Amino acid sequence: MTRLAPPDPVEERLADRLSARYGNGGPSTMVWVLRKLGKVDREVYRAVAELPTPWLDTPLRRVSGFANFSKPWFLVAAVLALFGGAKGRRAAVTGVAAIGVTSFVVNQPMKLAGERRRPQRTHLGVPEKRWVRMPSSASFPSGHSASAAAFGVAVGAALPQLKVPLRGAAAVVAFSRVYTGVHYPADVVAGASVGVVLGGLTAKVAARLAARRAVSS
């Protein structure tokens, strides 16, 4: 089967715009970097698609689907709120707030600005047994990866014993999005990076608010 690159990738569009605007005197290094990154991104995507791991198809497909609408993280937050005492409730609220902030930033300004098209799974060789529903939103950045990372960082800051398991779970979700073919690797890396930053900021704000309440009481 002949494999074709996805049509009109965003990094190629940006590179073409820079070349058209500045010509030979333009930022040639930036143009080269954009095209190189896009090429590497698609090569890694293909490499994941070609992994001989059929035993992972069903588990990772289910992980990817279950992570829709941040269901795992809301479930963890509910358990913490119900059984984690005062500290667990604070961690749950902080984690949910981090998801809210991150989801807004990723799904509004970032996806609208990026306009990256979703991968062409058929052309890029992703086995149909791995497929989940292809979202209609822009591909860059990954909202699933962003929310997972934000929740893990925010809750992990309040409850350090959960830091490793939550971040591990977030990594599995991020990988599942590439494995099932709905995101390029750069999408999940960017999403996770945004989630780490916003999750950390949310945790800091929550800690300061808690400290102020403690002083005032």
Regions found by a protein language model. Name each.
Residues 75, 105-106, 151, 168:
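Hydrophobic/aromatic residues in alpha-helical transmembrane segments
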Residues 126-217:
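Membrane-embedded catalytic cores of phosphoryl/pyrophosphoryl-handling enzymes
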Residues 98, 102, 106-107, 195-203:
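Alpha-helical transmembrane segments of multipass membrane proteins
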Residues 55-56, 87-91, 120, 159-165:
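Membrane-helix interface segments
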Residues 2-74, 107-137:
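N-terminal transmembrane-helix/juxtamembrane module of multi-pass inner/ER membrane proteins
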Residues 106-117, 180-190:
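Acidic (Asp/Glu-rich) catalytic motifs at the cytosolic membrane interface
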Residues 80, 106, 110-115, 156, ...:
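Membrane-water interface at transmembrane helix exits
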Residues 80-105:
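Interfacial segments of alpha-helical transmembrane regions
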